[in-house]
């Protein structure tokens, strides 16, 4: 049997870190040898997430205590906040340049330093790595991911919108200036740190929009849609927070270009993803339920005809912690390390 690859997870005490552990524990070709969580250093992973108590996992340590050169890690997942990430990875890759990285923060998703500074409020301090990073929407950039040392894992909202829209923009099948994305997220998308507005009594029985007109994922959507369309695209995007744990659900309104109908758009997407294991295009006119992807690495996409001539409604859904974060990160790892893309990710959605 081939020797297992040594894997580290930075920021293991958050939801995406825990999801990475869950997925990698059943991966036959890797071994988790490093888990960091500065505020939980010295604790066991099972102390932070009791579901991991039965498993033989390394003790949580602080990042500052890690000797990157001595660790000889094959790949690191970075689930740290933006700004912190660029400093940590600059140090890591200077001391262990052969280590590959999948970054789940926003630090390396945007290719223009000025755009990053505008949306995130500070200058980027690892510009060489920013230019090196490959955007990790696996189904679209698989060839680039395969050759990359540093992959910027896309955001959850952006993955859910880009998978249906990028193929249509590339095919010039829709008007690029008439895209409206109405998206909903589960509570885990807000992270694990304690916040008053995230208390059960504050979110239960309610539903609200946030970041209206200025959510940071708009910059990511604009960048990738502009590349696909071959011209500048400014998207209308409104996110909402819903009282469920997991899930992204996007309802997208588009106009067909040059007489393209909703059925034409459905055919384009069906052909695009017919061989992709983690994207399922429903029969025309059918729409997905977020429950049907929960806990899986799947994205379900539906296309329906609007009653307005020339317009179509696209509905896509994924699990924000899996395909929207850690699952896609493992998918990228598989491509980077030469494994089968589905390895460790082929479990179906939870039934309830």
Swiss-Prot record:
UniProt xrefs under HAMAP family: ArgC_type1
What reaction gets catalysed by this protein? Answer: N-acetyl-L-glutamate 5-semialdehyde + phosphate + NADP(+) = N-acetyl-L-glutamyl 5-phosphate + NADPH + H(+)
Where does this protein act, in terms of pathway? Amino-acid biosynthesis; L-arginine biosynthesis; N(2)-acetyl-L-ornithine from L-glutamate: step 3/4
One Gene Ontology molecular-function label: N-acetyl-gamma-glutamyl-phosphate reductase activity
Q: Which InterPro entries match?
A: AGPR_AS, AGPR_type-1, NAD(P)-bd_dom_sf, NAGSA_dehydrogenase, Semialdehyde_DH_NAD-bd
List the record's Gene Ontology CC terms alphabetically.
cytoplasm
Q: Gene encoding it? A: argC
Q: What does this protein do?
A: Catalyzes the NADPH-dependent reduction of N-acetyl-5-glutamyl phosphate to yield N-acetyl-L-glutamate 5-semialdehyde.
Source organism of the structure:
Afipia carboxidovorans (strain ATCC 49405 / DSM 1227 / KCTC 32145 / OM5)
What's an example GO BP annotation here? L-arginine biosynthetic process
Q: What is this protein called?
A: N-acetyl-gamma-glutamyl-phosphate reductase
Locate the active site: 156
Q: Which family does it belong to?
A: Belongs to the NAGSA dehydrogenase family. Type 1 subfamily.
Q: According to its UniProt record, where is this protein mainly located?
A: cytoplasm
Q: Which UniProt keywords apply?
A: Amino-acid biosynthesis, Arginine biosynthesis, Cytoplasm, NADP, Oxidoreductase
Look up the EC number in the record and give it. 1.2.1.38
**Alphabetized PROSITE patterns for the sequence:** ARGC
Q: Where in the cell is it found?
A: Cytoplasm
């Amino acid at each position: 049997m081939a020797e297992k690859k040594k894997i580290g997870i930075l920021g293991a005490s958050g939801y995406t870190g825990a999801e990475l552990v869950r997925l990698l524990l059943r991966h036959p070709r890797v071994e988790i040898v490093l888990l960091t969580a500065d505020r939980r250093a010295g604790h066991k992973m099972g102390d932070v997430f009791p579901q991991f108590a039965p498993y033989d996992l390394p003790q949580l340590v602080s990042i500052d205590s890690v000797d990157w050169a001595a660790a000889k890690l094959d790949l690191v997942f970075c689930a740290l906040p933006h700004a912190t990430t660029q400093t940590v990875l600059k140090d890591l890759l200077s001391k262990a340049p052969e280590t590959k990285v999948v970054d789940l923060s926003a630090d390396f998703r945007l290719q223009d330093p000025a755009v990053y500074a505008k949306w995130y409020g500070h200058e980027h301090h690892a510009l060489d790595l920013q230019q090196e990073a490959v955007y990790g929407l696996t189904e679209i950039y698989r060839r680039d991911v395969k050759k990359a040392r540093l992959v910027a894992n896309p955001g959850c909202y952006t993955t859910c919108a880009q998978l249906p829209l990028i193929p249509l923009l590339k095919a010039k099948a829709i008007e690029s200036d008439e895209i409206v994305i109405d998206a909903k997220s589960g509570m885990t998308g807000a992270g694990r740190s304690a916040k008053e507005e995230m208390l059960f009594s504050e979110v239960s029985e309610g539903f609200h929009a946030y970041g209206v007109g200025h959510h940071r994922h708009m910059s990511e959507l604009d960048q990738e849609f502009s590349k696909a369309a071959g011209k500048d695209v400014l998207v209308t995007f409104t996110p909402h927070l819903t009282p469920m744990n997991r899930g992204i659900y996007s309802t997208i309104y588009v106009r067909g270009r040059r007489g393209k109908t909703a059925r034409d758009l459905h055919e384009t997407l069906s052909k695009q993803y017919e061989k992709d294991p983690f994207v399922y295009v429903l029969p025309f006119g059918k729409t997905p339920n977020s429950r049907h992807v929960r806990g899986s690495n799947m994205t379900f996409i539906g296309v329906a005809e609007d009653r307005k001539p020339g317009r179509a409604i696209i509905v896509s859904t994924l699990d924000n912690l899996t395909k929207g974060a850690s699952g896609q990160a493992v998918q990228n790892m598989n491509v980077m390390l030469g494994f089968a893309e589905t390895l460790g990710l082929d479990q179906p959605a939870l039934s309830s």
